[in-house]
A protein has these predicted regions:
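Conserved Class I SAM-dependent methyltransferase catalytic core
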Residues: 22, 26, 229-232, 295-373
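Short beta-alpha connecting loops at secondary-structure transitions
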Residues: 220-223, 253, 284-290, 354-356, ...
Length: 497
C-alpha cells in the first residue's frame, strides 16, 4: 500500500471513533503518533551509530516496545496504557536539558498533546497502518515528506487558515534568494509547522555540507518558535524527518512574550511568514517601546525581526531577512509608518516582491508581499518587482497553486547584493523608488507599477468597510434632507395660516 493510501486509511479509521471530532482533532491525534514513530526510527539509527547509546526515555515507552507488534495490546488495555501511563510519563518526566536534550524534545512535544481516541481497537488499527511506513528507509522517508506537506494542507483546510502552510513555491524562492550558508544562524520566529526551516536545512545541506563535521554544524543552525501546540509538534516531527537529531531549538512559546530590549542581535538569516490580520492578547504590546506599541501581530513581528538580526561586525555583513507581509503593512499609517521609518533607517530594504491575488487561496484572499532587507546600512533605493500570473492563469486555487518555476524571471533579474544589485534594470515588472520619494510619501510603500496601466484592486474587507461608510453617509444625508423638507413644510404651513 502506498504512503498516501496509508494516511487516508488512518483518517478513515479515526472518523469511526466517537472521541475524535473534526479534521483538526484527527490531525492532532495523528501528529503525536507520527512523532513517536519517527522518534523511534531515529533512536534505532543512533543506537547503531553510537557505542553505549542510552535511550532518552524509558525503554517501555519507545514505539517498538508497545506499538510495533501488530498483535500487541489493543482495546481497553491499549487505551489505559496510552492515557494513564504513556502520556502521564512523557508529560511529567524530569529531564536534564544538557545531559538529555532528546528527552527534553519529547517532553516539550507532549506538553499539550492529547489522545482523542476513545476506542482502543480503532487506535490499534491506526497504529498498525502507521507501521506500514518505514521511516528508517530513506526512500520512504523522502516520499513521506510530500505526504507530510499534504497533511499540513489538510490542517489548514481544517479551519486554521494563514497560520501553518506557506506555499512551497514561495518558501523555496525565499530560501534560494536569501541563500543561508553553513554556520549561519537561521531563524523563523513564527515557524508554524517548519516549512521555511526545513527548506533552509535542505538548502544548506545540498549546497554547503561536505563532511560529517559540517552536518553537525548544520544541526545547530536551525532555530524556530511556535506559539501553538499542534503546529509545534508537527514542526518538531518535520525537523526530525529532515535529519535534525535533537530539535531543541524549536521552542514552544510566543516569541513576542519577552521585552524587545532583552533580545540579542545575533541572527544571520530570518525567513518567515508571520501571522497577519490578527491581534495579540492584552499586555504583549508592553514588551515594545511605548511609541511603537500596537496589538497587531505582523507589526510586532517586524519590529522583533529588525531587533534580532545581527549587526555588521568586523567587515561581516549584517543579518538579512525575507518576510511575507500583507498590503496593509505597506500602506498603513500610525505605528506602521514609524516601523517602516525604522526599517529603512536601520536596514537596507532593497527589494519588495509584490505577489498577485490568490497566492494563499482558498484560505485567505489577502494580497501579500515579500520584503527583503539587510541590517546595518540605511535604505537608498527600494526595488519593486511585480510577480505576474503565468500565461493563461487568472487566479491561483487549491488545485492550481503557484509553482516555483514562475519565479525564474525574478531569479534571472535578481543580481548580487554585494555590488548593490548593479545588474538590475527596470522592465515591465520591475521599478526602482528612491528613499527620498518614499519619505515624501510618508513611508507609504504601496507603490503601483509605473510601467503598466493602473488596475484598481481592493481588498474585499476594505470594499465592505467603504460600502458601509457610504451607506451611513447616505442615511445621514437622507435624515438631513427629511429635516430640511420638514422645516420647509412647517414654515409653509405657518405662512398660509
Amino acid at each position: 500500500m502506498s504512503i498516501s493510501s496509508s494516511i487516508k486509511s488512518i483518517q478513515d479509521i479515526m472518523r469511526k471513533d466517537a472521541g475524535v471530532d473534526g479534521d483538526a482533532q484527527r490531525l492532532g491525534q495523528m501528529s503525536w503518533l507520527l512523532f513517536l514513530k519517527v522518534f523511534d526510527a531515529q533512536e534505532e539509527e543512533l543506537d547503531l551509530e553510537q557505542d553505549d547509546y542510552k535511550a532518552p526515555i524509558d525503554e517501555k515507552y519507545l514505539w517498538r516496545n508497545w506499538a510495533a507488534d501488530a498483535e500487541g495490546i489493543t482495546g481497553d488495555k491499549l487505551l489505559e496504557f496510552v492515557n494513564d501511563d504513556l502520556f502521564y510519563h512523557l508529560k511529567n518526566m524530569v529531564v536534564n536539558a544538557e545531559k538529555n536534550p532528546r528527552g527534553l524534545v519529547v517532553k516539550a512535544a507532549f506538553s499539550d498533546a492529547f489522545n482523542y481516541m476513545k476506542n482502543g481497537t480503532l487506535l490499534r488499527q491506526v497504529i498498525n497502518k502507521l507501521n506500514e511506513i518505514d521511516f528508517t528507509d530513506s526512500t520512504e522517508r523522502h516520499l513521506f515528506g510530500d505526504i507530510y506537506e499534504q497533511i499540513l494542507k489538510d490542517l489548514q483546510s481544517a479551519g486554521n487558515a494563514g497560520e501553518f502552510y506557506t506555499p512551497r513555491a514561495i518558501t523555496k524562492f525565499i530560501v534560494k534568494v536569501t541563500d543561508p550558508k553553513l554556520g549561519e544562524s537561521i531563524m523563523d520566529p513564527a515557524c508554524g509547522t517548519g516549512g521555511f526551516l526545513a527548506c533552509s536545512f535542505d538548502h544548506v545541506k545540498e549546497n554547503y555540507v561536505i563532511t560529517s563535521a559540517d552536518h553537525e554544524t548544520l544541526q545547530k543552525q536551525i532555530h524556530g518558535v511556535e506559539k501553538k501546540q499542534l503546529p509545534h509538534l508537527l514542526c518538531t516531527t518535520n525537523m526530525m524527518l529532515h535529519g535534525i537529531e535533537v530539535p531543541v531549538q524549536i521552542k514552544h512559546g510566543n516569541t513576542l512574550n519577552k521585552p524587545l530590549s532583552s533580545w540579542d542581535d545575533e541572527i544571520d538569516v530570518i525567513v518567515t511568514n508571520p501571522p497577519f490580520g490578527g491581534t495579540e492578547e492584552d499586555g504583549i504590546e508592553k514588551n515594545f517601546p511605548s511609541e511603537m506599541q500596537t496589538r497587531e501581530t505582523a507589526d510586532l513581528f517586524l519590529q522583533l525581526i529588525i531587533e534580532v538580526l545581527a549587526a555588521p561586525v568586523n567587515g561581516k555583513q549584517g543579518g538579512r531577512a525575507a518576510v511575507v507581509l500583507p498590503d496593509g503593512t505597506l500602506f498603513g499609517e500610525g505605528v506602521k509608518t514609524k516601523i517602516k521609518k525604522m526599517l529603512t533607517e536601520e536596514c537596507n530594504l532593497h527589494t519588495i516582491v509584490r505577489l498577485p491575488n490568490g497566492v494563499f487561496n482558498p484560505y485567505t484572499g489577502i494580497k501579500t508581499n515579500i520584503l527583503f532587507f539587510t541590517k546595518g546600512k540605511p535604505t537608498k533605493d527600494v526595488w519593486f518587482y511585480e510577480h505576474p500570473y503565468p500565461e493563461g492563469v487568472k487566479n491561483y486555487s487549491k488545485t492550481k497553486p503557484m509553482k516555483f518555476e514562475e519565479f525564474q524571471t525574478e531569479l534571472d533579474w535578481w543580481g548580487k547584493e554585494s555590488d548593490g544589485f548593479a545588474a538590475r534594470v527596470e522592465n515591465e515588472q520591475a521599478w526602482k523608488v528612491s528613499i527620498e520619494d518614499v519619505i515624501a510619501r510618508n513611508f507609504n510603500l504601496d507603490i503601483k507599477n509605473p510601467h503598466q496601466d493602473e488596475v484598481i484592486a481592493h481588498d474585499p474587507q476594505e470594499l465592505l468597510a467603504s460600502y458601509q461608510q457610504q451607506q451611513q453617509e447616505i442615511a445621514e444625508l437622507r435624515n438631513q434632507l427629511k429635516n430640511i423638507l420638514g422645516d420647509a413644510l412647517t414654515s409653509s404651513t405657518g405662512s398660509e395660516a
